[in-house]
């Protein structure tokens, strides 16, 4: 039976104790915002959230930066039907980003807890578009087979870190720590030890 990202799924993993809670999410958002602003040397203006689910990044993000423009995409018909209009969410699968360019490159591109569920062919189809859409920082929270992460293991693809690193670097991303990657547009701005 195919995995369903319905209300029951989001209740289980994000509301009923699930994985991390609001405080952890707020810290994650603050880290991504601060990193983007540090590297851009200006306030954050635009955010694209790929695989956004119910758009949970939106509230803590707008609490920090009320003027930021947030746009989310997800493949959950439930999440888009329920929250699409109120939270500026649209329907798309990861592979759709091979051609989908909903806006100019953004300051912060978020793809949190998504890539380790995306089949390799679809991942390889969508990643170049993700690189094009990122003008600042990409927060690519991804887990590997060696991580002791807890959470939804249904459909988890236990790849090694090199699998992701090779793909991200081939597209021009440079790792700067804590799931943050400099976009190809900013990669040359980092000092050697920022990317070591």
Where are these regions (language model features)?
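A conserved beta-strand element that flanks and buttresses the S-adenosyl-L-methionine
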Residues: 110
């Amino acid at each position: 039976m195919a995995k369903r990202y319905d209300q029951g799924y989001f209740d289980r993993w994000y509301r009923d104790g699930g994985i991390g809670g609001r405080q952890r999410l707020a810290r994650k958002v603050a880290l991504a915002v601060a990193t983007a602003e540090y590297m851009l040397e200006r306030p954050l203006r635009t955010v694209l959230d790929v695989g956004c689910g119910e758009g949970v990044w939106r509230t803590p993000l707008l609490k920090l930066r009320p003027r930021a423009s947030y746009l989310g995409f997800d493949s959950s018909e439930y999440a888009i039907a329920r929250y699409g209009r109120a939270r500026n969410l649209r329907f798309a699968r990861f592979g759709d980003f091979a051609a989908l360019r909903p806006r100019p490159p953004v300051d912060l591109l978020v793809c949190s807890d998504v890539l380790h569920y995306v089949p390799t062919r679809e991942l390889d189809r969508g990643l170049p578009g993700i690189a094009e859409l990122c003008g600042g920082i990409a927060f690519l929270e991804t887990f590997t087979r060696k991580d002791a992460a807890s959470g939804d293991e249904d459909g988890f693809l236990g790849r090694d870190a090199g699998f992701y690193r090779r793909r991200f670097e081939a597209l021009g991303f440079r790792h700067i720590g804590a799931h943050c990657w400099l976009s190809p547009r900013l990669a040359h701005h980092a000092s050697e030890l920022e990317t070591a």
